[in-house]
From Swiss-Prot:
Pfam families: Ribosomal_L22. GO terms for cellular component: cytosolic large ribosomal subunit. HAMAP family: Ribosomal_uL22_B. Part of the 50S ribosomal subunit. GO terms for molecular function: rRNA binding; structural constituent of ribosome. Belongs to the universal ribosomal protein uL22 family. The gene is rplV. PROSITE patterns: RIBOSOMAL_L22. Keywords: Ribonucleoprotein, Ribosomal protein, RNA-binding, rRNA-binding. GO terms for biological process: translation. CDD domains: Ribosomal_L22. InterPro entries: Ribosomal_uL22, Ribosomal_uL22_bac/chlpt-type, Ribosomal_uL22_bac/org-type, Ribosomal_uL22_CS, Ribosomal_uL22_sf. This is Large ribosomal subunit protein uL22. This protein binds specifically to 23S rRNA; its binding is stimulated by other ribosomal proteins, e.g. L4, L17, and L20. It is important during the early stages of 50S assembly. It makes multiple contacts with different domains of the 23S rRNA in the assembled 50S subunit and ribosome. The globular domain of the protein is located near the polypeptide exit tunnel on the outside of the subunit, while an extended beta-hairpin is found that lines the wall of the exit tunnel in the center of the 70S ribosome.
Length: 133
């Protein structure tokens, strides 16, 4: 798996104090495959998203689950109310592409592109008045 970088961006880049963020850089999965899973959890409550990721049979779900658990721990460390958290943003950006040549028939070679992703998950507390019943 890639390296997990935790950045406290509460004072810059438009992030607010009631948000928590975790970024996994250089994840060994194609951004297209990661986006399929991340689209499913965006906007959901944290508990629902964890359950959903546990039952999705994809590699991207395992990676996203680890990042989600990390961002939940960041929110807990920040003192946010875990019951009011929802996933505000879940994106997979393009990382670098590892290129290697594979020998083929008749003296040819073709390039294989191993795509890497940067996965970002942002949690935010729901406002007091907008509690779901």
């Amino acid at each position: 798996m890639g390296q997990l970088r935790i950045k406290d961006k509460s004072q810059r880049d438009g992030y607010k104090p009631n948000q928590s963020i975790a970024i996994l850089r250089y994840a060994h999965i194609s951004p297209l495959k990661a986006r399929l899973v991340l689209r499913e959890i965006q906007g959901k409550d944290v508990g629902d998203a964890l359950y959903l990721l546990a039952v999705i049979p994809k590699k991207a779900a395992r990676i996203a689950e680890k990042v989600l658990k990390s961002v939940i721990a960041n929110a807990e460390q920040k003192g946010l109310d875990l019951d009011r958290l929802y996933i505000k943003k879940a994106v997979a950006d393009d990382g670098p592409i590892l290129k290697k040549w594979i020998p083929r028939a008749h003296g040819r070679a073709t390039m294989v592109r191993k795509r890497l992703s940067h996965i970002t998950i942002v949690l935010e507390e729901k406002p007091e008045g907008k509690e779901e019943e």
